[in-house]
Amino acid sequence: MIPALPRWRWALYLLPALLGVLPTLLSPGHIVGDGVDAYGTGWFFWWIKTCVTQFGDPSWTPLFFAPDGKNIFADTGNNFVDAVFSIPFQVLFGQSWSGPFTFFLLLGNTWSFERLAAELWSDVRDVIVATAAWMVNPYVVFELTAGRPTQAVMWWFPLAVLMLHRICRGDRTVRTAAALGAATALTAWTYWFAGYFLAFLLIPLGAWWSRPGERLGALRSITIGALVCFVLVAPMAVGMAIAWKHGLVPGVNGGGPEAANVDADLHGVWLMETRGAPLLIQPAWLVAALTGAVVGKREGRVWFGIALVLTAIGLGARLGGGRIMNPVWSVVGDLPFLARLWFPYRITMVVMLPWTMLAVLAWQRFGRRTFVAGLFLALSLTGEAFSGTFPFNHKDAACPPLVLNAAKEPGMFLVLPGGIQSDVLLWQTQFQRPMFAGMGESAPAFWPSGYANRRHNSWIKALQESSASPNRPHVAPTGDKSALTQLGIRWVLLRRDLIIGIWRNERSRGGKDVLKGRDAKAIAQLNVLLGEPAAADQRLILWDVLGKYTDPAFPVTGEKLATPPLDEEDRPGFERGMIRMHRMPE
């Protein structure tokens, strides 16, 4: 019987959610999260709203890698469930939609998990403590602060576990079986690999929960659920199989993690835990889980065993920098598209379920004392705050007026230096002009063939080298700058602030003096190639290849060109936390 839950529990749930998004709510125009994935998320959410409201095709966009465009379906599998749910928030709150939507996301996570917890435990205190812990578990907090709400949406998978539990306890109705399939399919539609992660969790749970003598009946219901799931994911699966057959799927039809600019040593659980944000080994959670495994008797041992198996999958296909094959992957590695799982640490999303169960078992052993539960939650949030993940990082998504003014006239943008994923993706949601490169330009696996060829154009190479390596000798481009207009490029935008990131390694070796003069050299070389700039502020310089545009609001002056931006990078808060914990170099 599901226990009656007091209404005051929502105050306990809502408080950490509100604390997490409060800095974003107090910063109009900001999005939750920071870093490269946050930029892409902000763009995708805007794109889905645009497609829904204007009846466009979300599977392809002409705004990146113009004129080729970008095949979004082949690159992402159209994981847009969370983006669709964000549309009302974008309409209601405009550029400040992200904070309210993230609050809603956390409430959805809480509601679905509480349904499961209320079925597994009869004591109201267990349900409330487990749900409060789930709200702030390190995986969800880290994914949100890094700008990945898609991976933090866990609305459906607790419901799938709930339906499986009911089936294994004797509920053989078609409705429950269909609900199991639908919840699993929705998990996959939200983030495709989460469908695999959930299946890896459901298999041992089904074997454990099903009663001897009733397993055949449970298997029949589970089979019905699997069929429902297959029907619901079939549109994507068939489309992706066709794209795979035609060699259109990056990472499956060629190009591994390195081709996607992913360090092979940083995408599995172990090195994520030791070099990135601590998730499973965050001290409060690790102590609670290990305690639960010891004092929880058989139940604790089973939950801990399930967590270990799932974590073994999350180590990735190869260990030790690629030298050792993970034996677990000899079992799961041949599943369709799993070769594209460049971030297997994300299986932590389902490992957090047994981790939460173990924490509750430990709490029960301590007599369900309120002080112990409060201490655990406080230490969990303190650990996340120390690592720089809580409250959630946030980023100003506003497009600079200099760019908005230029974009009132037609033309493609070439952003320099190239090969860097930056917040210009967020700006594009407002200036809405095509770009020469765009999302994925730092990852060769995602380049259209036409873009890969155009990068070798002598003018493109000259502009890139002038902005990124002004101290090195360059080969002069052939012909005049009309070669750029033939590519469709009108606007060349120099991000002076991004140049600092390119020179970070040399700065760390030789100090700030090594940067002296480089900014001026880059501008001088670009002026030789493009002529005088059309507009400038301290961090941006804009050239009009056609030579027809000037912006009186941002006049080009010698003082502006001679004053470089502050030579400090705007690094995400969680990266600063990793530096503080000596997990990431400065």
Where are these regions (language model features)?
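Membrane-interface coil-to-helix junctions
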Residues: 16-109, 132, 137-142, 148-154, ...
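Periplasmic/ER-lumenal interhelical loops and adjacent helix-loop junctions
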Residues: 35-51, 226-294, 333-336, 340, ...
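Extracytoplasmic
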Residues: 379-586
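Membrane-embedded helix bundles of polyisoprenyl
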Residues: 13-19, 101-120, 125-210, 225-229, ...
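Membrane-helix boundary/interfacial segments in multi-pass membrane proteins
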Residues: 143-151, 255-260, 309-354, 451-458
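Membrane-interface junctions at the ends of membrane-embedded or membrane-associated helices
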Residues: 1-6, 118-120, 165-178, 207-221, ...
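Hydrophobic alpha-helical membrane-interfacial segments at the cytosolic entry of transmembrane helices
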Residues: 9-17, 182-183, 215-238, 256, ...
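Hydrophobic, aromatic-rich transmembrane alpha-helices
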Residues: 2-3, 207, 211, 228-231, ...
